[in-house]
């Protein structure tokens, strides 16, 4: 169950430990709608940080909403299988079908702000994404496809060039934390 996955997650730093604590407290009070967008203050989201097999490139999409290159992901929309959501979103948003988890367990927990915006002509108030992130591996030779209603680009970006592509500075430390986690996992499983 998704709550157990979050409870059993081992934070990598103090900020993650605090985010985990806040997430669990909020989930406890809002179990009836935390997996849906009906909770307009905060809801569970899932991201997939996709790397190539060498771990030197990451597959990013150009988010129309955030006007920046970033990871794949989306709302749980009632699905409590968070890894399945991460894989589904990765496939839908990039066109890559042969994507697999580097680990069955999440590698990051983050509370991220989403500023007010319009989606499909309707106003969306500012809110929080309680984000659970999985590390995914994909074949960089596979054909990429843009999902026009969400992104306007899909590209393999060298890890060392992320700061040149990502215009959301708060996400860069998270991305680098995930690259490091992937390298540790690959060392451990090799």
Label for each model-derived stretch:
Residues 1-12:
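N-terminal domain-onset segments
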Residues 10-47:
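Acidic, metal-coordinating catalytic segment for phosphate/diphosphate chemistry
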Residues 36-71:
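N-terminal strand-loop-strand
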Residues 59-61, 74, 145-147:
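Short histidine-centered beta-strand/loop micro-motifs
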Residues 68-74, 156-157:
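A short, polar/proline- and glycine-enriched secondary-structure boundary/capping micro-motif
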Residues 77-173:
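Unchanged
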Residues 167-190:
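Charged phosphate-binding loop/patch that engages nucleotide di/tri-phosphates or the phosphate backbone
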């Amino acid at each position: 169950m998704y709550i157990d996955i979050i409870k059993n997650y081992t934070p990598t730093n103090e900020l993650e430990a605090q985010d985990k604590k806040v997430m669990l407290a909020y989930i406890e009070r809002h179990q009836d709608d935390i997996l849906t967008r009906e909770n307009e203050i905060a809801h569970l989201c899932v991201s997939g940080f996709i790397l190539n097999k060498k771990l030197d490139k990451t597959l990013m999409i150009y988010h129309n909403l955030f006007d920046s290159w970033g990871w794949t992901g989306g709302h749980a929309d009632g699905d409590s299988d968070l890894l399945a959501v991460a894989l589904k979103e990765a496939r839908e948003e990039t066109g890559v079908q042969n994507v697999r988890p580097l680990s069955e367990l999440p590698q990051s927990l983050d509370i991220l702000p989403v500023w007010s915006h319009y989606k499909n002509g309707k106003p969306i108030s500012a809110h929080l994404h309680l984000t659970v992130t999985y590390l995914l591996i994909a074949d960089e030779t596979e054909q990429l496809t843009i999902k026009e209603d969400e992104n306007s680009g899909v590209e393999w970006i060298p890890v060392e060039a992320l700061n040149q592509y990502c215009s959301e500075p708060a996400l860069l430390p998270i991305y680098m934390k995930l690259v490091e986690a992937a390298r540790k996992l690959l060392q451990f499983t090799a």
